[in-house]
Amino acid sequence: MNTPKELRYTKEHEWVRVEGENVRIGITDYAQSELGDIVFVELPEVGAEVTANEPFGSVESVKTVSELYAPISGTVVEVNEALNDHPEYVNESPYDKAWMIVVKPNDLSEIDNLLTAEQYEAMINEG
């Protein structure tokens, strides 16, 4: 399982990468492997407001539908439209091609509430 050290993580298996004043959000390698083959991704529109710990979209796999939870509150400034035609990117490249949304946070310090890579790995290893 791949857990990049420079990212922050949620207990719901989203990852966050700080990029200047914005954050890029996706789901973890662990999450995609648990879900199985992803067949559909539903994401919000640019301009939508997201609230920390609240759903902002969903991923549908051959096994189940799983909600996506915002790790931080703010405004969606970019959406990965490529996932409309290529949901399989979530399985193939969860930290690169399969980012979900970019958010301009209301308060970037909310990132401090998220898990480090080490904390996230410990959580999933506890099962």
Curated annotation (Swiss-Prot):
Q: Is Protein biosynthesis there in the keyword field?
A: no
* Note describing how the cofactor binds: Binds 1 lipoyl cofactor covalently.
GO terms under biological process:
glycine decarboxylation via glycine cleavage system
Annotated Gene Ontology cellular components are: cytosol; glycine cleavage complex
Sequence ranges assigned to domain Lipoyl-binding in this UniProt record: 22-104
Cofactor(s) of this protein? (R)-lipoate
* Record key words, sorted: Lipoyl
Question: Which positions bear N6-lipoyllysine?
Answer: 63
Primary role: The glycine cleavage system catalyzes the degradation of glycine. The H protein shuttles the methylamine group of glycine from the P protein to the T protein.
Tell me which NCBIfam families the record gives. Answer: gcvH (TIGR00527), PRK01202.1 (NF002270)
What family does this belong to? Belongs to the GcvH family.
How does this protein assemble? The glycine cleavage system is composed of four proteins: P, T, L and H.
Supply the name of the protein: Glycine cleavage system H protein
Recorded source organism is Geobacillus kaustophilus (strain HTA426)
